[in-house]
Amino acid sequence: MTKYFLQILIILLSINTLNSQNLDSLNISRINDTIVSKFLNEKRSIEIQLPRSYDVELEKKYPLMLVLDGDYMFNIVSGSVDYLSYWGDIPENLVVGLNQKDTRFKDSSVFDNLTHTPITSTANFYDFIVSELIPYMSKNFRISEFKVIVGQERTANFANFFLLKQNPIFRGVISISPRISTNMKSYLTQQLSKTNSKIVYTLSTSTNDFESIYKNVSDLNNSLDSIDNKNLRFQSLIF
């Protein structure tokens, strides 16, 4: 999984201007925090990894990478980001993981029966990210305008909904083996075909996934790959 994710990150992110010597004597810092959400009516645990240069380059702002399924994905993603940024393959990122161990389905998979868009608990989770989590991170940490969201299966599909807005809060999406919901291929293809925002989208699956996931992701890949829009940078990793 880690090797697989390294490939995805290299595809998604640009080459860093720093080299490994700049970061050699610096250490990463991790913070465990809690956000009290009015939308969710509960507390949510987050884990934050600060870039190695965060306490040295005090004027610098860093891309934010939000990791859904953070209870098991955070260490994979944050470790990969630190490794690749250390060697200068990608820029340093501030990584935040959102624990969804007991809330994964209600957070990401409650949809309207007709439109198949988020309702009730999933709509609330969407609002929590947009109106509470991101503002909290912006207020308390030095983050740049470029934000990436990472999800797997259910949360990977959920991450796509952020791209359906006129000015999406996330300009980068890493979609790992998404469980693609009804209408999502159509919604996503239509929106990305006409978007005026610069979007970086990376899609992945493998033959080790469930057959339905592999087939649906392959179909989505074909659809997105056919889009002719200079604002979309689309890459896929299917094997």
How would you name each of these model-derived features?
Residues S78, S131, N160-L164:
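Short, hydrophobic alpha-helix immediately C-terminal to the catalytic nucleophile
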Residues S20-P63:
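A domain-start/cap signature at the N-terminus of enzymes
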Residues E145-T195:
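Primarily recognizes the serine-hydrolase "nucleophile elbow" in alpha/beta-hydrolase
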Residues M1-S25:
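Bacterial Sec-dependent N-terminal signal peptides
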Residues Y62, L68-M73:
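Active-site glycine-rich loops that stabilize anionic/oxyanionic intermediates
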Residues D71-Y126:
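Active-site machinery of serine-nucleophile hydrolases
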Residues S181-F239:
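The feature captures the conserved acid-bearing segment of alpha/beta-hydrolase catalytic domains
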Residues F111-E153:
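Gly/Ser-rich "nucleophile elbow"/oxyanion-hole loop immediately N-terminal to the catalytic nucleophile
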